[in-house]
């Protein structure tokens, strides 16, 4: 059976691994998931990202990041736009997450961007998720 929302599955896997403080997790690869993982790495929410070829679709291995005293860097992840209810934001409506402490992942005509990048480039798009 096919998965109806692979992005929500990826976010749930990250959330679950983070809650039990796993060092790493693996998710089936896709182009959007690779972009999400790269943004999480660039913004400092995860330590590292690896791509593993398995002669099928590939695997993304995500290494989670924890602070001193093993405190979580990712406090929360929330899927916003879902297959049953898409959520779009115009250029001037791109949301801020916790007044800039978190990020919103926005799928735009210029690729997947954070809310800050979307505002800087003055583009809107589909609000995929919030990470804080």
Swiss-Prot record:
Keywords: Ribonucleoprotein, Ribosomal protein, RNA-binding, rRNA-binding. One of its GO terms (cellular component) is ribonucleoprotein complex. It holds the Pfam family Ribosomal_S8. GO terms for molecular function: rRNA binding; structural constituent of ribosome. InterPro entries: Ribosomal_uS8, Ribosomal_uS8_CS, Ribosomal_uS8_sf. Disulfide bonds: none annotated. This is Small ribosomal subunit protein uS8. It comes from Lysinibacillus sphaericus (strain C3-41). The gene is rpsH.
